[in-house]
């Protein structure tokens, strides 16, 4: 089961980078992972992306291994959903970074879209992308302290106004709703109740300047 690797690889043409598959490691391959990181730091690779083993479980060794290296920047855990356990680190004295993405498919997708992709834009010297707005078609309630990235369906009315409908099945392991979606709805922190008709920030699931209507 390596759907996350295939998904990221499928985006390589859209995001202007060459993808090299580093393979799959087992739960007990902590030492192998450490050796791979060291090898990648010494190579021409600019960005290391992992998927899984970043939470707080017994076999989630990625944070512990990454912290063994000399780092100039490190964070783990953000008040978002999906993707809360995401990890980022920059290695000292080399222009290389690592993103540790959560293992659930939707978490991987959201974190790539909202963390890895903006980083790529930055190193390419491209201006930060701005969301477009759409009217909410259904009420939504969430935790006030958390930013939510929601699988949604974008449509347009007869007079050309954009509308967004939040889909059922927002759990990070549910693929069907992700396949049925064509946009990410970003529901900001500091607010719990989002009412029908409210304008919501929207992002294409695979980057800007692409046709997101199906």
How would you label these PLM feature ranges?
Residues 4, 8, 32-37, 41, ...:
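General structural feature for long, well-ordered alpha-helical segments within catalytic domains
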Residues 3, 57, 144-146:
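Residue-level recognition of alpha-helix initiation/capping sites
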Residues 65-214:
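Flexible glycine/proline-rich
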């Amino acid at each position: 089961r390596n759907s996350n690797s295939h998904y990221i690889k499928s985006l390589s043409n859209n995001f202007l980078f060459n993808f090299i598959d580093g393979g799959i490691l087992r739960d007990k391959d902590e030492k192998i992972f450490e050796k791979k990181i060291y090898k990648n730091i010494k190579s021409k690779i600019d960005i290391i992306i992992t998927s899984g083993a970043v939470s707080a479980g017994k076999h989630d060794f990625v944070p512990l291994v990454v912290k063994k290296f000399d780092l100039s920047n490190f964070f783990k855990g953000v008040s978002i959903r999906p993707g809360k356990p995401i990890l980022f680190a920059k290695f000292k004295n080399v222009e290389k970074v690592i993103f540790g993405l959560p293992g659930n498919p939707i978490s991987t997708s959201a974190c790539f879209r909202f963390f890895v992709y903006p980083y790529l834009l930055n190193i390419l010297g491209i201006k930060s992308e701005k969301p477009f707005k759409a009217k909410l078609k259904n009420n939504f309630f969430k935790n006030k302290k958390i930013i939510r990235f929601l699988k949604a369906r974008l449509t347009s009315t007869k007079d050309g106004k954009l509308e967004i409908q939040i889909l059922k099945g927002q759990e990070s392991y549910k693929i069907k709703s992700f396949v049925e979606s064509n946009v990410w709805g970003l529901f900001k922190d500091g607010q719990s109740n989002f009412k029908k008709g409210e304008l919501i920030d929207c992002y294409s699931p695979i980057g800007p300047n692409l046709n997101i209507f199906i």
